[in-house]
Curated annotation (Swiss-Prot):
Sequence positions that bind Mg(2+): S102, D242, D244, D246
Residues at the catalytic site: S102 (phosphoserine intermediate)
Protein name: Phosphoglucosamine mutase
Protein encoded by which gene: glmM
Purpose of the protein: Catalyzes the conversion of glucosamine-6-phosphate to glucosamine-1-phosphate.
Protein family (similarity comment): Belongs to the phosphohexose mutase family.
Residues modified to Phosphoserine: S102
Cofactor: Mg(2+)
Family matches, as InterPro entries: A-D-PHexomutase_a/b/a-I (IPR005844), A-D-PHexomutase_a/b/a-I/II/III (IPR016055), A-D-PHexomutase_a/b/a-II (IPR005845), A-D-PHexomutase_a/b/a-III (IPR005846), A-D-PHexomutase_C (IPR005843), A-D-PHexomutase_C_sf (IPR036900), A-D-PHexomutase_CS (IPR016066), Alpha-D-phosphohexomutase_SF (IPR005841)
Amino acid sequence: MVKYFGTDGVRGIANKELTPELAFKLGRYGGYVLAHNEGADRPKVLVGRDTRVSGEMLESALISGLASIGAEVMRLGVISTPGVAYLTREMGAELGVMISASHNPVADNGIKFFGADGFKLSDAQEEEIETLLDQDNPDLPRPVGTDIVHFSDYFEGAQKYLSYLKSTIDVNLEGLKITLDGANGSTSALAPFLFGDLEADTETIGCSPDGYNINDNCGSTHPELLAEKVLETESDFGLAFDGDGDRLIAVDEKGNIIDGDQIMFVIGQEMHKNQELNNDMIVSTVMSNLGFYKALENEGIKSNKTKVGDRYVVEEMRKGNYNLGGEQSGHIVMMDYNTTGDGLLTGVQLAAVIKMSGKPLSELAAQMKKYPQSLINVKVTDKHHVEDNEDVKKVMDEVETEMNGEGRILVRPSGTEPLVRVMVEASTDEDAQRFAQRIADEVQSKMGLE
């Protein structure tokens, strides 16, 4: 069976790999699987997209596929991924679909599904859709005549979502100056409206999408321009979102970049103080900084590690009934409010902590001392056997001994590329780079491409 779904839906180069034909089939078969699972003859489906030029093309094809199975489709227009997840749940829809490739370049696009509960589909549901995709025109229902349903626009859904986000905090943000970077994506209009409505003084960059400039040297994967703007405008802090608004990276008043680990620590510390952190636990991935775990330990907060990927964080949170988790990359899940990483929600919560504490972000984040980190990608012939390679393990053991507990090693295969990622954290930049290079050289020697 062909594997269409990755860790975050179906992605590819728009009109080449992710074609309108495939989008039609995903709509038709995805609509059928979810309608069948929910016991709905005429499922309600919400469809949102980011600002990519290919979004409208794929949206039209997807909606046609959904309509062909008898779905009642409501178009949300440009909205964030977590906005789709929230509205799917809130409006009692059987299915939510987001058309976006998140932080990827403009040429890419993707389609991800949310079930009626607002969570991404299970592996079993994705496999059911893939089975239908592999069949040649499977025999599925085809409504005709009056059984075909109109689709409608529900662009006011974005406002409903923003009103909800505003209700998650008890303070306004008057007196705070915040610079916002919308990555020329889904949050370009949403973020300025939300933070302005909360009475913050806002400056913006990356909030002028033209269909082609999404994530182009802006947003959470390029926070350097935001750092410059924060200093230039003397803002209290800056918030950078990614193309579909499910990530957040911050910048403090001194221009320092504050990553997902630090944001989770600041918010988690406040939740713990207020006895709002379920089981005194934060869920993170193996990529979180060693300094993150040490800072949590100092605060009496427990941690739980998962594989890289926000879906694994969410799985662990649901299993243990935890309400805060996320990734260093800025996917932060606050389960009390939403079912997926939500950059706007995280930004609002972080801003509320800053406002209520009366402390600058630099001071709040400084309680977590980050260990210098070095990451090297090595192209290999077979990424899946790196953990079994005795020579690589021997060098890793030697480095562990030399670090004497003041560092961490992570060697893992990439989830999407023919790469092995070597990550080392150590007490100094020099040590982190030296140790990472030593391990990477061994991986290259034993497993690398000629």
